[in-house]
Regions:
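Mature catalytic core of soluble alpha/beta enzymes
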Residues: 1-177
């Protein structure tokens, strides 16, 4: 499940190739205690956000790319650009169609075979986002740990190598993937 406050775990798991040992159960447990969107208080009148738990953090990195792609699409459409794709680090937001075709063709990578596709999507006024454990991970003692963290347990997700979601919004597709 998506939780904007999962940023409290950003120092527990490192997915930049530098992590060589497992974090302790205690470190994970202490970090998970700082996660929970239900502890975020929004005050619209004062334009403030209050984080109830000490050490709690929020971050938009996980959905920010989709949001940026959607905003880019909206700006270009408002400027009269009739067709295009905004690619925000793999989160795509498309409108119109390319010359001499009726849809944008976007390949979905095969997580088990490099440089191979499992599907080609045809996009018009659509967005697509993919999240997967096959490109960004930590390898410890020969085992790969996904960068997709379960906010309730603090542990990397297991069982899915890749999830691709298409829909009208890259932000929402990213959220679901």
């Amino acid at each position: 499940a998506f939780d904007i406050s999962i940023v409290a775990l950003d120092k527990v798991w490192l997915f930049d190739g530098s992590m060589t040992t497992m974090p302790s159960e205690e470190v994970i447990k202490r970090s998970v205690e700082k996660v929970g969107y239900q502890h975020i208080r929004l005050d619209s009148a004062a334009s403030t956000i209050f984080l109830e738990l000490p050490g709690m953090k929020i971050g938009f990195g996980s959905i920010g790319k989709g949001y940026a792609a959607d905003r880019g699409r909206e700006i270009m459409k408002a400027k009269g650009i009739e067709a295009g794709i905004v690619n925000a680090s793999g989160d795509l937001s498309a409108w119109g169609s390319p010359p001499q075709d009726d849809a944008w063709k976007v390949g979905v990578n095969n997580p088990f075979k490099a440089h191979r596709m499992v599907k080609v999507l045809r996009l018009n006024e659509m967005a697509v986002a993919t999240s997967g454990s096959y490109e960004k991970y930590a390898e410890i003692n020969g085992k790969r740990y996904s960068h997709i963290i379960n906010p309730k347990t603090g542990w990397p997700s297991v069982g899915l190598a890749s999830v691709t979601v298409s829909g009208p919004s890259a932000e929402f597709a990213n959220f679901l993937s």
